[in-house]
């Protein structure tokens, strides 16, 4: 066996390694409006249309007078999606970003985050 054949065999063996496969455990979606009211309700509806699940409302941890936020006031909605639905939503999100992410989007532990300005880009009206 030559060196080239040996190297290609090693590459193929690495490619078949189960530990190199990407696995999506969960997808956490979050919309923070910063105030309670109509905008928060609309954000909850958008998240419900996107995931098919009822989102959970998040409360402010402490009062921030400059932003007009009071402690325990509902200011955001979030939802956790798992399984094939998570893969489908992630595919839509990456398509909006044109499958390009920065190195800074990834953490050392294998997580990554991305933001989408308009939910209409995801195919939700």
Swiss-Prot record:
InterPro entries: Ribosomal_uL5 (IPR002132), Ribosomal_uL5_C (IPR031309), Ribosomal_uL5_CS (IPR020929), Ribosomal_uL5_dom_sf (IPR022803), Ribosomal_uL5_N (IPR031310). GO terms for cellular component: cytoplasm; nucleus; ribonucleoprotein complex; ribosome. This is Large ribosomal subunit protein uL5. The keyword Protein biosynthesis does not apply. Gene3D superfamilies: 3.30.1440.10. The keyword Ribonucleoprotein applies. The lineage of its organism: Eukaryota, Metazoa, Ecdysozoa, Nematoda, Chromadorea. Its main location: nucleus. It is found in: Nucleus; Cytoplasm. PANTHER family: 60S RIBOSOMAL PROTEIN L11-RELATED. Belongs to the universal ribosomal protein uL5 family. Keywords: Cytoplasm, Nucleus, Ribonucleoprotein, Ribosomal protein, RNA-binding, rRNA-binding. Component of the large ribosomal subunit. Component of the ribosome, a large ribonucleoprotein complex responsible for the synthesis of proteins in the cell. The small ribosomal subunit (SSU) binds messenger RNAs (mRNAs) and translates the encoded message by selecting cognate aminoacyl-transfer RNA (tRNA) molecules. The large subunit (LSU) contains the ribosomal catalytic site termed the peptidyl transferase center (PTC), which catalyzes the formation of peptide bonds, thereby polymerizing the amino acids delivered by tRNAs into a polypeptide chain. It comes from Toxocara canis (Canine roundworm). GO terms for biological process: translation. GO terms for molecular function: rRNA binding; structural constituent of ribosome.
């Amino acid at each position: 066996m030559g060196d080239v054949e040996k190297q290609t065999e090693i590459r193929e063996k690495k490619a078949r390694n189960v530990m190199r496969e990407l696995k999506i455990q969960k997808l956490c979606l979050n919309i923070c409006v910063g105030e309670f009211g109509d905008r928060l309700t609309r954000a909850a509806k958008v998240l419900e249309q996107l995931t098919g699940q009822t989102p959970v409302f998040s409360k402010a941890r402490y009062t921030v007078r400059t932003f007009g936020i009071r402690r325990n006031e509902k200011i955001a909605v979030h939802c956790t999606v798992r399984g094939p639905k998570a893969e489908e939503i992630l595919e839509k999100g990456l398509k909006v970003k044109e499958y390009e992410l920065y190195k800074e989007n990834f953490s050392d532990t294998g997580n990554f985050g991305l933001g989408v300005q308009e939910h209409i880009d995801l195919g939700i009206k």
